[in-house]
Amino acid sequence: MSGSAVTCDTCTGTNKPNTAETACVVCSITDYANCDKENVCAACDNGKYLTPTGQCVDSCDKLGGYYADGNVCKRCSPECASCSTAGADKCLSCPAGRVLKYTSESDINGGGSCVDECKANTDGCADCGATIGGSRYCSKCSTITEVPINGVCASNTVSRANICTSDGKGACSACTAAGYFLLDGGCYKTDRQPGKSVCTTESGGKCTTCANGQVPNNGVCPTCPAGCSKCSGSSICTACLAGYYLSSSKSVKCSENSTNGGNIITGVPNCVSCKEPPASSGTVTCYVTQEPSVNPTDPSVNKGGLISGAITGISIAVIVVVGGLVGFLCWWFICRGKA
């Protein structure tokens, strides 16, 4: 009909409807096996994995809190920051304030459970002065016969004495075993949590390669700016944590806009995992979205509750009054009839 809008929901061949469903276009996402719409995949190929928003990625790890199940990225248990597979005992790393306890020390790749972070004067720890990834670990044990190994107090037996040189006060003064480095009074292994999130190689008990790309200063790894997983120097991001994208060497939240060399990058509301757009211009590619949580103290929420509560209360009151009136009239006429 003349003047009516054209709607396209089915296309021929491999073309798909564009976002506005006004035309058929070639799917713009690379590595797709089946495309639902212009920017939405139904399946991925070439060893890629499908995200919840229909994008194709080379690893589910970059989503943060997802694991690969076949060719699909699936959500880890809420207890985990990352995981090997489904289950609260399959965590590979933990959210801030929680620490990883491996299910089996002989199979650390299988993961473990996230438990409470270090608390002073608990579990043999006198001081929780080591902080890694937003979680606290023991830096000094309560008794001089124990030392912090991987952030937990352990008896300094003959076997562990080969790992840590005790300072005689419940902490380590040096790490002597291969693969261990000294950090805040404890010895940490480079191939397991929490040490691997700080340091990937060591020499002589000191870190030589920082996990965040920084150059260690006498064995100590400088921190990166907020939102950065890797950086060069104290202010230049080279890679971002899940929930951020790279713009002008800074990490910006997926939901926020930014300017990159004169180009505008537009964030996506409620997006919690993303990457910067092609050519660093346009809208970010969002991997995961999350509905905003409802704040029970929000006045609008309370008003809604009060309105619905008031309506319910008024309705009940009307029913009671009408019922009472009908009952009274019935009694009145019955009594008068008898009289």
Locations of regions flagged by a protein language model:
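Disulfide-rich, cysteine-dense extracellular ectodomains and adjacent flexible linkers of secreted
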Residues: 1-339
